[in-house]
Amino acid sequence: MAWKNVIASGDIPVSPELVWLLVRDFCGKWHPAISTMGAEHDKSGRLLRVFTVHSQDVVYRERLTWFSDSDRSMSYTHVEGIHGVEIYNAQLLVSNNKDGGARITMTAKLLAPDPRDEEIAIGTKKIFDEAIIEIKKLTKLPMPLQAPSNSNFAYDKPIQTFAFGDTPRLAISHIGEPSETLCLFLHGIGGNKSNWNQQLASVAPYVQSAALDLRGYGESTLGEIQSNVDEYCDDILSVADRLGALNLVLCGLSYGSWIATSFAMRYPNRLSALVLSGGCTGMSEALPEEREAFRLSREVPINEGKTPADFSEDLLPVISGPDISNAIKVELLNSMQAIPTETYIDALKCFTNPVEKFDFSKITMPVLLMTGEHDKLAPPDEIRGVAKRIFETAPEPDVRFECVTGAGHVCNLENPNSYNTALVDFIMRVIQ
């Protein structure tokens, strides 16, 4: 057997954004060959489209493996229906063409015995060509101006805050009805649980949600020893037990993303999904001398007798985007200025002493990665690269990547509407 590659492309004189709105629904019934179309979810929440075509009795199933509104791309894999194929992976991409319009590119890579491989390749090319012709026709009809959003439903109950335990004492904000699944938010090294209030309210209509003050932050206390990632994972399990949750959707920002991924390495069976914002690998892939240099540079103001409150304004330009509002500036400053020096040092030592390099083949759950358009600490190209690595390494990938427009490092605060739209859309799918 040998690999066969199929490619088809075409230009359309309308914007790529409008073309993407037409085709972004993986289970959309727009192709002229489709007779029936439906959606299914496997036990891990992965999305499959189930369809039949005209003049055939065959049922086809394809599973979504990659999706990005930001990059206007999706990838999928064959599950059932194509006789004789061993592997069949395909992609649809909508990009800018040189004339200011849209270019649609559809590709497939397949493996099947000879001569069946050639038959499948010819059939695929025909399907792709028909798709591009149909899309050109559809762009001449009235179209929606934006993708549907599920993030604007209000939840009419307030966020409740409480603490439990002794050393450490863990404080959480909680909202939503008790359920087997909990969406737990983990803040960054300069934040606290209140940074997630807008996300808690957006997610609560669909699943119970909580935000944790990490050890030493906000209303939580430090433990008896230097914090490490295993203790953070124990804290996550403690919160889940306290709220009666068997399964978790972990949503982290920066330092919290690194902790969330560390949890995924240890307890993949407890995770329904993983949401990583403004980070993932932390310093786990940096050389020892790079980690040490990073730690020492961050400790300079501390060694000069300053507290986080003293140097928070110096950090603000590093973590914020160019269009940050005054209200969000104040919120970020308040978060950073509230960090005790002891807590800052504790988190810094933990962050710069990772115990492992992540093995993305252990990622068995759906993953959403987001970062701000203007994030200097976790730039879009870097996080897109991490997303691609997970896509290429995970045994059954289900990866989504989004770049949050206009936002800096704390993208959930700077552009909550875009952030919440992607988050809620993702959560609604994976907790089916």
Regions found by a protein language model. Name each.
Residues 1-43:
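Hydrophobic ligand-binding cavity/cleft-lining segments
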Residues 31, 40, 54-101, 109-111:
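Hydrophobic-ligand binding "helix-grip"
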Residues 108-150:
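A conserved amphipathic terminal alpha-helix motif
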Residues 168, 173, 194, 198-201, ...:
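Active-site loop/oxyanion-hole signature of alpha/beta-hydrolase fold enzymes
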Residues 261-266, 271-304:
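Flexible "cap/lid" loop of the alpha/beta hydrolase fold
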Residues 285-292, 305-361:
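Conserved alpha/beta-hydrolase catalytic His-Asp/Glu region
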Residues 363, 369-371, 375:
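Short beta-strand/loop motif that positions the catalytic acidic residue
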Residues 395-432:
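Catalytic active-site module of serine/aspartate enzymes centered on a nucleophile-bearing elbow/loop
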